[in-house]
């Protein structure tokens, strides 16, 4: 019985992480949870991001992002900055779902 409760508690703790990484791009920097800069090359990125067409495609904090229409639907609000030095997170948009991943795990907490 104790085992059942333990598993239930663990499942509840990790449940939010299993949902889609729903992202909304805000208009102003002060509205954002994370400031993002898009780099030109994979090797410069902290995170390789794949833009998922459907929220069911995106999972957890693995770089599979689904951009939502409304701010209230988002897990994270991001702002695209003009300069690399202003960013909390450097991303590269990859055309391949299989390539989506963290290159700098130290910044992974930004998207939880």
What feature does the model see in each segment?
Residues 19-112:
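Repetitive, compositionally biased segments used for assembly/scaffolding
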Residues 1-15:
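Sec-dependent N-terminal signal peptides
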């Amino acid at each position: 019985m104790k085992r059942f409760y333990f598993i239930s508690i663990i499942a509840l703790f990790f449940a939010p992480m299993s949902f889609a990484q729903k992202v909304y791009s805000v208009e102003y920097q002060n509205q954002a949870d994370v400031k993002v800069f898009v780099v030109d090359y994979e090797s410069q990125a902290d995170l390789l991001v794949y833009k998922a067409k459907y929220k069911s495609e995106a999972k957890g904090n693995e770089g599979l992002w689904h951009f939502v229409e409304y701010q209230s639907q988002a897990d994270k609000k991001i702002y695209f900055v003009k300069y690399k030095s202003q960013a909390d997170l450097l991303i590269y948009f990859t055309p391949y779902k299989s390539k989506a991943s963290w290159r700098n795990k130290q910044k992974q907490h930004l998207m939880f």
